[in-house]
């Protein structure tokens, strides 16, 4: 199973829909940078509590070279920056999990393998850990996660779930 470095948004939204444990079932090691931990726990909500409840499988990792953070901070959040730096410092990380488009583009430019929360849900369905992706995407939207109609349909199709015949 792959090792992953996860940003705050995937942790928060997977926690909000009760699916944070999918990370443990899909990936051998889950690492979050200190900045991500700080972002998630800035307000003490259920996402923060769930991370604190899972100390055995969510590891808080510190980046080695703090000076690299300045290169990316103009357009990215501290957690996203640390995810990318940590992935570059630790070549054993197989994947980074980010939801922000600018962060994903930057990570890909750096040669990192990237997925997002929807990719995690698709992988979970392919591995029969969840029955359907569509109801979970609807829960994400209800919790404030923005998904365009095109992306919604693309993910639904990739999951092999029925698209309506007419729009």
Question: Can you name each region flagged by the protein language model?
Answer:
Residues 2-95, 101, 109-112, 154, ...:
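Active-site-proximal, substrate-binding regions of enzyme catalytic domains
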Residues 104-167:
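Acidic, PIN/NYN-like endoribonuclease modules and their adjacent C-terminal/linker elements
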């Amino acid at each position: 199973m792959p090792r992953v470095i996860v940003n705050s948004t995937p942790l928060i939204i997977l926690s909000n829909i009760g699916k944070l444990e999918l990370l443990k079932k899909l990936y051998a090691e889950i690492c979050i940078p200190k900045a991500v931990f700080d972002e998630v726990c800035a307000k003490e909500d259920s996402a923060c509590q769930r991370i604190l409840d899972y100390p055995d499988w969510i590891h808080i990792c510190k980046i080695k070279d703090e000076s690299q953070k300045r290169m990316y901070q103009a357009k990215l959040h501290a957690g996203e920056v640390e995810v990318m730096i940590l992935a570059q410092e630790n070549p054993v990380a197989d994947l980074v999990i980010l939801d922000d488009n600018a962060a994903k583009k930057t990570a890909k430019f750096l040669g990192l393998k990237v997925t997002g929360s929807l990719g995690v849900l698709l992988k979970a369905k392919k591995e029969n850990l969840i029955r359907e992706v569509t109801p979970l995407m609807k829960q994400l939207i209800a919790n404030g996660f923005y998904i365009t109609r095109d992306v919604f349909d693309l993910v639904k199709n990739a999951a092999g779930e029925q698209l309506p015949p007419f729009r």
